[in-house]
Amino acid sequence: MELESLKLDHYRNYSDLTLEFSSGVNVFLGENAQGKTNLLESIYVLALARSHRTSSDKDLVQWQAKEATISGRVKRSISETPLSLHFSNKGKKARVNHLEQSKLSHYIGQLNVILFAPEDLELVKGAPSVRRRFIDMEFGQMNPLYLYNTTQYKRILKERNAYLKRLQLKQTTDTVFLDVLSEQLVDVGSQILIARQEFLNKLELAAQPIHAEISDQREALKLRYMSSVDFASDASLEEVKSVFADALSRQRSREIMQGSTMVGPHRDELQFDVNGNNVAIFGSQGQQRTTALAIKLAEIDLMQQETGEYPVLLLDDVLSELDASRQTHLLLAIQDKVQTFITAPTLSDIARQLIRKPRVFHVKQGVITLENDT
């Protein structure tokens, strides 16, 4: 899979921009605050219909403009597909092959991307919500049903929390509707729990040899999925539903008292252990970065296994955060395999040696020029 071209209209600091890309490595060089990250963000948004930098689509629209459009042409092994996203005060519209999609879950997955940025180092040591979002966004690209279920779960959870708040404030005493919402939450949430466990099992298998290689076989990586629903890793869907329902039943009084759902996928945690220790607490910064890098590289292979296509890799100012050894592992792993977009102030000697025939763009105050045109 590759992104052949990108067009931005009134997106961030770009009024009108069209770029054609190499199927290999594309590099955007420039100082900070020139628009490099905006370019990678636009590719991420084109793929996932949301930004990793802001929760408000209004931030994506250029200052004093009323609407913005991102469009691109995606090449797969057997087809080419035009994609576009249009943002306005009426919301966003997603199109595939020029046809508007009724649901974003029908759109996401047309272009698969993996982003590796300095903040992704927080994947290991950041808040649990960072890791839950990581699972949902990465697995959601591979599995449309999972993406749909997470959307449904959030809707039910919001409604259930609102009703718990009403019970807390004694605006109602009727718990029959709470039973209905609990049943819906269990039905959808149990599917999410099983899917997450299966995804993390596969991710662990893919990441372990990569992690061992980067650490020169000195360290062993283990992924631990710690759910607020205490189900066995090999449990059936019906068994998970039963355990989930029992957990909600036991927590009912506490939930009404606090006006919030205390059990479910939204409370789950992912932990990374290295040599049996939680790397977020006991690991060095080097071990934490090795873990994050191994997970990101494992995603590439796992996405290819699950979808039949390699994803597009976005490296946003991350090379400078890695030492020479980790830079080498990263660049060798993607060589001649994955279309890659890199932003950096400059390229290190290592990067220039390992990146074959990159297409280099220079970015200055939102103006982009090809290196061989300068």
Swiss-Prot record:
GO terms for biological process: DNA replication; DNA synthesis involved in DNA repair; double-strand break repair; SOS response. The keyword RNA-binding does not apply. GO terms for cellular component: cytoplasm. InterPro entries: DNA-binding_RecF, DNA-binding_RecF_CS, P-loop_NTPase, RecF/RecN/SMC_N, RecF_2. Keywords: ATP-binding, Cytoplasm, DNA damage, DNA repair, DNA replication, DNA-binding, Nucleotide-binding, SOS response. PROSITE patterns: RECF_1, RECF_2. Coiled coil: none annotated. It holds the Pfam family SMC_N. It is found in: Cytoplasm. GO terms for molecular function: ATP binding; single-stranded DNA binding. ATP binds at residues 30-37. It comes from the Bacteria. The RecF protein is involved in DNA metabolism; it is required for DNA replication and normal SOS inducibility. RecF binds preferentially to single-stranded, linear DNA. It also seems to bind ATP. Belongs to the RecF family. NCBIfam families: recf. This is DNA replication and repair protein RecF. The lineage of its organism: Bacteria, Bacillati, Bacillota, Bacilli, Lactobacillales.
